Amino acid sequence: MLLDLVEKRRSIRKFTDEKVSEEDLREILTIALHAPTAKNRNPVRYIIIRDKKRLEELSNYKVNSAKFLAGADVAIAVVTDSEIAPNTNHQDASIAATYILLAAADLDLGATWAIVVDAKHESGISAQDFLHKFFDLEDKFDVECIIGIGHPAEEKSEKVPFEYSENVFEDLHDKLK
């Protein structure tokens, strides 16, 4: 059941040295390619990074919160073409990233994402500018997030869901505060 998979998925930032198989990576990306996009425009593209030196460099694309990428076996940059869907590219990429995270969990792999929007590189330039140079991207492309994937070297406790009655409303009126 999907709920079991959603409950199983945790943000994993520590990985073993075990390699993610090509078959697993292909399955993850095949699932991502099924992600819905607004008006089925499909502005989302994926860049796979496996080279350890490149992963180390990539882990510095923003201050502090992308360090886990250096320990991942593989990273997937979720990129959008802003000419295809300029008003929905961020949302389309977020849906695709969620599919990737769930697919990784289904394969007993660990994964988490690091967002790019409004992030700064340690040099002071935007993370987006750094990543454009890093990947040699045309201006029409935006890197939305980068997902590190590997075999988990940590276990996370079960996530306690948010309280249903405090977050779900049948009618707004004055209930939402």
Language model: regions and residue ranges:
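Acidic, surface-exposed loops and disordered segments
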Residues: 1-177
